[in-house]
Design a protein with these regions (language model features):
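Short cysteine/histidine-rich zinc-coordinating motifs and their immediately flanking basic loops
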Residues: 153-160
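Immediate flanking context of iron-sulfur cluster ligation sites
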Residues: 61-71, 118-140, 174-177
Length: 182
């Protein structure tokens, strides 16, 4: 596991606030395009999200060995709506990081419970994402368009790589699992 993911896990709320603070610089005339370029480069190579379907999320859950449920950090930090907060399903590399972070916030759940939570929240017209840090997928989050930081970065500030589609996301996740076993 890359050392960046544990560091990010411990300071996630601070990073989300920092992202939203710094991204406002992209609206300044002289530094805006440079800021947008840097943010897109960072999202592409270091940390960002993939928009996934409910079916993709279910396949990823089926392939995962351990799952944990915790609060959606975006919704926990920004409080822009009244949708449920307990919607982040930590997978794979993220499980180890977040279990060390706080056993009070994250609890281990079954695949059936994870799917039930996905379906329950899907009816609220939310978006499903899988997040990556340094190429490691670490969480499936079900968030809303008013709180989701990657969604807001893309829609409000034109940071295209903050949240992208990848038709091969399930295959990419399975490949990551295979490589972790070797």
């Amino acid at each position: 596991m890359h050392h960046t993911l544990p560091f990010y896990g411990w300071h996630q709320h601070k990073f989300l606030r920092l992202y939203m603070f710094l991204i406002k610089l992209t609206r300044l005339p002289l530094v805006g395009s440079l800021g947008r370029y840097l943010a897109n480069s960072y999202a592409r190579s270091k940390h960002g999200g993939y928009l996934i379907t409910l079916e993709d999320a279910e396949q990823i859950i089926d392939a995962s060995n351990t799952l944990a449920l915790g609060p959606c950090s975006c919704r926990q930090v920004f409080h822009n709506c009244n949708l449920p907060v307990m919607t982040e399903i930590v997978i794979s590399a993220g499980r180890e990081v977040y279990s060390k972070k706080s056993n009070k916030e994250f609890k281990q759940i079954s695949k059936e419970e994870a799917k039930r939570i996905l379906h329950q929240n899907h009816r609220s017209n939310v978006i499903h994402t899988i997040m990556h840090c340094q190429g490691l997928f670490y969480a499936i989050c079900t968030c809303c368009s008013c709180c989701c930081v990657p969604y807001r970065l893309k829609k409000e500030y034109n940071i295209e790589y903050a949240l992208i589609r990848n038709r091969n996301i399930v295959a990419d996740y399975l490949k990551q699992l295979e490589e972790a076993e070797v």
